[in-house]
């Protein structure tokens, strides 16, 4: 196609393509201007992670992992180079705090922390020489937020001052057990906080490992023992308690664990036998008084009450015998009498109550004795609706006169009050009590006879 000279000039002047030139400096300057426009058209390279559509290659054609690496300085010392850097300063707030590198090196090498051919200090060296706040270019956050191992443990020391439990929770979640235990061993306040926290959340496994590391044998044993509370099956709980017998408890605690194991073992036997008797309907006590609950996992006193209620007359050789339980678990006389009295009085078995307090001396004489005091006996009998004759018998056995009169008046044991006033020769008190009994009753007649007697020398 033939073109005139004017057409050619118009083509070259209007085309976006530049004519070829042998002037290296002019060509380099045009490259630098193109580079500046390309940089200005991009977003701030600190936020370049969102620009997934951009081709991540360097200007030399080398693929890189970040756009921040793709910014390359060109060789040259023209004024336009300084102008490009000034615009970059405006776009990156941290740029002013970095040392200015010589123009013979690229920014990509700077951010990678290594040099191009030649000598250039690394990124860590450059940052160490900078007194101002430093940044992590990849994250755009101050490096001071990232702490090393020793600084992390300076946080745990604040627990002593500020009681910041969240620090301990964070360390528990992020550190291995060995490191956590070793560091807490020299921080007793933080250690106590962690132990309390583990107990609250029920992390028995970590708590046992901690006590084992600290060589706290008794606390280790107690923590292991507490796990039986989470076992519902009686047989499995019994087997678990058996494993606790040999743990390094104190002598007193070891005896308690042994007793608990023995008690549960007996409860399992008693429960199986009584369930069979109750379902068969052949035993009168179970027909009249059906069981309201299972005996399994009940305390010792409850088990004794159960035995006194359902198995009171059994021989000592059986596991369910109250006497057997008393001897096996060394139950004191006071506790045994109090429990047996409550059980037999509830059944209104007054003969058993009488036999419970009757003792014989070596000459064969009988005497009533109550380790709990007869005033307690009277209160329990009245609570279980004992007849007045039974109440009067035991009120008379109270030794203290004032207590006897108060109990007799409270529970309307008229004969006891009248006889006591007569023995005290207290005419005024007897007259006052006469107004409290029914008119025309036998008690009123008895009081009149005593008041009219000439053989009594009244003190008032």
Curated annotation (Swiss-Prot):
One of its GO terms (biological process) is spermatogenesis. Residues 121-133 have a biased composition (Polar residues). The modification Phosphothreonine is found at residues 21, 115, 130. Residues 73-82 have a biased composition (Low complexity). GO terms for molecular function: protein-containing complex binding. The keyword Transport applies. The modification Phosphoserine is found at residues 119, 122, 128. Keywords: Cytoplasm, Cytoplasmic vesicle, Differentiation, Endosome, Phosphoprotein, Protein transport, Spermatogenesis, Transcription, Transcription regulation, Transport. The keyword Nucleus does not apply. It is found in: Cytoplasm; Cytoplasmic vesicle; Early endosome; Recycling endosome. Residues 70-101, 121-141 are annotated as: Disordered. One of its GO terms (cellular component) is recycling endosome. InterPro entries: Spe-39. Belongs to the SPE39 family. Interacts with VPS33B. Associates with the homotypic fusion and vacuole protein sorting (HOPS) complex; impaired by VPS33B. Interacts with RAB11A. Proposed to be involved in endosomal maturation implicating in part VPS33B. In epithelial cells, the VPS33B:VIPAS39 complex may play a role in the apical RAB11A-dependent recycling pathway and in the maintenance of the apical-basolateral polarity. May play a role in lysosomal trafficking, probably via association with the core HOPS complex in a discrete population of endosomes; the functions seems to be independent of VPS33B. May play a role in vesicular trafficking during spermatogenesis. May be involved in direct or indirect transcriptional regulation of E-cadherin. This is Spermatogenesis-defective protein 39 homolog. It comes from Rattus norvegicus. The gene is Vipas39.
């Amino acid at each position: 196609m033939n073109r005139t000279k004017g057409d050619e000039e118009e083509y070259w002047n209007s085309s976006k393509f530049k004519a070829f030139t042998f002037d290296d400096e002019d060509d380099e300057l045009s490259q630098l201007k193109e580079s500046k426009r390309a940089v200005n058209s991009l977003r701030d390279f600190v936020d370049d992670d969102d620009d997934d559509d951009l081709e991540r290659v360097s200007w030399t054609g080398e693929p890189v992992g970040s756009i921040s690496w793709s910014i390359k300085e060109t060789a040259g010392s023209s004024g336009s180079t300084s102008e490009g850097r000034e615009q970059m300063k405006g776009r990156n707030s941290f740029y002013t705090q970095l040392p200015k590198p010589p123009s013979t090196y690229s920014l990509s090498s700077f951010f990678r922390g290594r040099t191009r051919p030649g000598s250039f200090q690394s990124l860590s060296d450059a940052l160490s020489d900078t007194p101002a706040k430093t940044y992590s270019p990849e994250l755009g956050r101050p490096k001071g937020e990232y702490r090393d191992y020793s600084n992390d443990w300076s946080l745990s020391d604040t627990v002593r001052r500020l009681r910041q439990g969240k620090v301990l929770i964070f360390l528990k979640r992020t550190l291995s057990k060995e490191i956590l235990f070793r560091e807490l061993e020299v921080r007793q306040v933080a250690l106590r906080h962690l132990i309390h926290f583990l107990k609250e959340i029920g992390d028995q496994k970590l708590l046992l490992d901690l006590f084992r590391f600290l060589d706290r044998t008794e606390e280790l044993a107690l923590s292991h023992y507490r796990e039986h509370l989470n076992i519902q099956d009686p047989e499995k709980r019994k087997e678990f308690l058996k494993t606790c017998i040999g743990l390094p408890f104190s002598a007193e605690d070891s005896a308690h664990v042994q007793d608990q194991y023995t008690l549960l073992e007996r409860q399992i036997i008693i429960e199986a036998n009584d369930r069979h008797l109750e379902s068969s309907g052949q035993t009168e006590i179970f027909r009249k008084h059906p069981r309201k609950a299972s005996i399994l996992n009940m305390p010792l006193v409850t088990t004794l009450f159960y035995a006194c209620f359902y198995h009171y007359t059994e021989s000592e050789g059986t596991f369910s015998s109250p006497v057997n339980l008393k001897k096996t678990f060394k139950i004191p006389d006071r506790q045994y009498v109090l429990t047996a009295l409550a059980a037999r009085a509830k059944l209104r078995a007054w003969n058993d109550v009488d036999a419970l307090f009757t003792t014989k001396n070596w000459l064969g004489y009988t005497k009533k004795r109550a380790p709990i005091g007869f005033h307690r006996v009277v209160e329990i009998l009245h609570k279980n609706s004992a007849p007045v004759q039974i109440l009067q018998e035991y009120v008379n056995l109270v030794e203290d006169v004032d207590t006897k009169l108060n109990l007799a008046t409270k529970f309307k044991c008229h004969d006891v009050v009248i006889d006591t006033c007569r023995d005290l020769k207290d005419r005024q008190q007897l007259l006052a009590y006469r107004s409290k009994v029914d008119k025309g009753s036998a008690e009123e007649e008895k009081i009149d006879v005593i008041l009219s007697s000439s053989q009594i020398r009244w003190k008032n």
